[in-house]
Amino acid sequence: MSNIRIFVSHRIDIDSETVDTPVYFPVRCGAVYDESNSEIQGDDTGDNISKLRMSFCEFTVQYWAWKNVDADYYGLCHYRRYLSFSDKHYNNTAFNMVRELRLTAHEKKKYHLDDTQRINNVVQKYDMIIPVVAKASEMSYNRAEVKTLREMWESYNGVYFEQGIIDNMFSLIKELSPEYYNSACEYFSGEYHRAFNCYIMKKELFVRMCEFQFPIMNRIMEITDCKTYERAPGYIGEMLNGIFIHYMLTVENRSAKETQLVFFVNTEKINSAKEYYKCRIHAVADKAVRSVADKIFPMYSPRREKVKKL
């Protein structure tokens, strides 16, 4: 059995549910700022960049894993986003994620998050486990009409980052990692987005991705207005993650399994049986209402936005 570690980036201000198996490794993101006595491992030990949490987001956890943990496979998930290991296909949201209200024992079983043997069997067959792609046209800011991934990201100019940051990223790729430049151009000219920084990779690929991402993210932080756009380096990291995966698939022909990404609206711990069953009833009711409402008021449609303002 391979040593597989999926690092789950946790917020320091929320006591989130964890998946307690040998595979999942919860880590507090930005733990250097945490004044609590949490038992969850922090990203502030050993070689770390924990203090950059506000700009690098979950990448401080990725960096910590790279520098401080030895494994055969490295994965990254988010306290509200997990890769599904179920063979069943579930209905997606506009961002091509499955939506669940809570993370409970029921959901862990449903998506086989608690099945260590199953996860091992799946992961060892591939170089990478990655989320299914999302259409760039469905992820633009304010539902702006876009055709390419570049146009999608540029719709966030002045929202998530300053104008010109994408050009800066391309220049840095050409300077620091020119072997990825053509793949970057091809990926950004395409119609699909590999979003949310969730994946599992063989150690070799994980190390190569880190060596690709962090030098560019560090330079972006040096030349970008991070006071206004604090999380800009993190968004660049997400773009670089997609570029790296695209390169591995199209240039090196690496094997990959695409699986659904599950988004949990609320992952705060449930402390009683009464609260658990209340959540289950709420989840069933929410699904029933959405099955009707989403057809009448599609996600991010002008009609839906007007109703939300009432």
Please provide the spans of the model-predicted regions.
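ER/Golgi luminal nucleotide-sugar-dependent glycosyltransferases, focusing on the catalytic module
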Residues: M1-L310
